């Protein structure tokens, strides 16, 4: 997905969310989009708002790198910084204040907005089926839960026996019943179970260790020429574990590499 205009799979979800909001009248032409994010979601929001003639304001901690801030501003986004010591609570407080100041502004909420998985039900899942054919295993990381849910629901319609496997960090095994923890695998393991994740479609959860994920991320670049992010390394680590199982011999294992690694070089 690094070939998406914003460099990540989040482009699909953001485009679907913005189009859905505009079609329902929740977001007017030339309207204002607000969100709190210091990750790849911000790039997708900034880029797509620019392309759709929308104003974009993003809240993030002041610990964000100057280059990251410049990237977002290059798309015309307005950046509101909060003290890093206040953590996510400080960002959410600032976001709430901005919403009070502009009640007509639209907040995407990628973790619970059903337009996000719909992008993958209608797009990514059918694309995989066209390109791959029968799929025996779908292995994907869980951030907002949108890509795994949407792809899985779409693929299961054509491949009812496909096993759906979620990937999460070993250090934050919330889907496995553990406790949230800090980790460097940006894009997965948010520390909670998102509303957009369809738990009922999951057959299994695989926990991946940080060193294994980062090693495969580097291997993708050095041996395959694919400069992907850490969540891609995590997904690939889990997919390899699945492919090595005796029962997977001769089967088709599909995984998703969500974003470009360039943004993590700062």
Regions inferred by a protein language model and the residue ranges of each:
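PLP-dependent amino-acid enzyme catalytic core
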Residues: 1-266
